[in-house]
């Protein structure tokens, strides 16, 4: 496809709006390729590894190509000397002396610094960057692991991952963590007493895995309960314990609401369904209240319908302070008349 026929998308355009040349998009061949690559943490100066992108100027970033840095340094050192020599013919004698001194100083500096240590210094800096970044990452990882270790036993159980939950449930020589939900009060001096609701007897296998009695809530433990499918231990976790004890009959799953016609497992051979009601509804232990006839009150208390009173004539509203006192007295117990009489 011809290049002129390609659509001009913004990603293919320069900052000036022109189409860039091919050499910019070839890796490492263009002249201004360096600014296209993202600044990696290895290129950042020491102490700025975690700085936000864009906050560090590209001048502070070391170039990747060590040889290019050497060539640039040589050019920078040679250019002022050449300029001074070309201009020195038109200058006065004093300026000549000063310029030659400057040139000699720069030449001495360039002769004193050999070319090979530049490469070793940049390599050492690069290694220092790598070591510093690795140390920083190691410290962060250690801090994260420490936080996990510290918070694991004290954090609420639903915030922990699944594997941690199973490990905490089956942890030897410690009471199950889930029972902290059943505790009544926190004592200030000693750690909270953990206890389980229901009748509990310890199994012979491990000291902490508890099994409820047959008259309790749950059935015997299935084999292979360490799988993630049995994540919540039904013997220690209150998440699996039902709110009420299940009935002994085999038909407790088939029961519907009160008074509905249900067919029990034990009654399946009967063709006609029976109405099943709990005992609490079949027997009424409470006696109904006696019907009180609407009697008129005694003449002592009943003086007729209430007489309307205008608000402006009432003595409470004459002084605003007295009305405020009455309002307070009517709303609070400590200022009420009943308290004064008592």
Swiss-Prot record:
Of the GO CC terms on this record, one is: MBF transcription complex
Residue spans with biased composition (Polar residues)?
205-218, 309-323
Ranges of biased composition (kind: Basic residues) = 271-280
A molecular-function term among this protein's GO annotations: RNA polymerase II cis-regulatory region sequence-specific DNA binding
Extent of Basic and acidic residues compositional bias = 97-114
Annotated compartments: Cytoplasm; Nucleus
**What are the UniProt keywords, alphabetically?**
Cytoplasm, Nucleus, Repressor, Transcription, Transcription regulation
Spell out the subunit comment.
Component of the MBF transcription factor complex.
Q: What is this protein called?
A: Transcription factor nrm1
Organism per entry: Schizosaccharomyces pombe (strain 972 / ATCC 24843)
């Amino acid at each position: 496809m011809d290049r002129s026929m390609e659509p001009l998308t913004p990603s293919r355009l320069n900052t000036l709006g022109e189409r860039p040349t091919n050499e910019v998009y070839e890796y490492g061949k263009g002249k201004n390729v360096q600014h296209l690559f993202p600044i990696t943490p290895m290129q950042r100066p020491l102490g700025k590894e975690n700085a936000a992108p864009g906050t560090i100027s590209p001048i502070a970033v070391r170039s990747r190509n060590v040889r290019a840095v050497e060539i640039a340094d040589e050019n920078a050192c040679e250019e002022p000397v050449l300029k001074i020599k070309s201009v020195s013919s038109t200058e006065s004698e004093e300026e000549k002396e000063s310029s030659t001194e400057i040139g000699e100083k720069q030449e001495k500096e360039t002769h004193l610094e050999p070319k090979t240590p530049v490469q070793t210094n940049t390599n050492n800096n690069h290694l220092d960057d790598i070591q510093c970044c690795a140390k920083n990452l190691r410290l962060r990882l250690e801090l994260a692991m420490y936080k996990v270790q510290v918070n694991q036993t004290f954090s609420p159980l639903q915030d922990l991952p699944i594997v941690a939950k199973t490990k905490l449930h089956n942890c030897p020589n410690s009471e199950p963590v889930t029972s902290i939900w059943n505790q009544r009060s926190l004592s200030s001096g000693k750690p909270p007493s953990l206890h389980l609701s229901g009748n509990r007897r310890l199994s012979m296998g491990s000291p902490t895995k508890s099994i409820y009695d047959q008259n309790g809530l749950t059935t015997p433990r299935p084999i292979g309960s360490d799988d993630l499918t049995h994540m919540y231990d039904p013997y220690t976790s209150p998440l699996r314990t039902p709110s009420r004890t299940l009935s002994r009959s085999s038909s407790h799953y088939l029961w519907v609401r009160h008074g509905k016609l249900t067919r029990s497992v034990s009654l399946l051979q009967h063709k006609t369904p029976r109405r099943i009601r709990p005992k609490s509804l079949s027997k009424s232990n409470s006696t109904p209240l006696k019907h009180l006839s609407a009697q008129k009150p005694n003449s002592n208390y009943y003086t007729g319908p209430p007489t309307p009173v205008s608000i402006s004539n009432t003595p409470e509203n004459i002084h605003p302070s007295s009305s405020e006192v009455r309002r307070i007295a009517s709303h609070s117990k400590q200022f009420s008349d009943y308290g004064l009489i008592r």
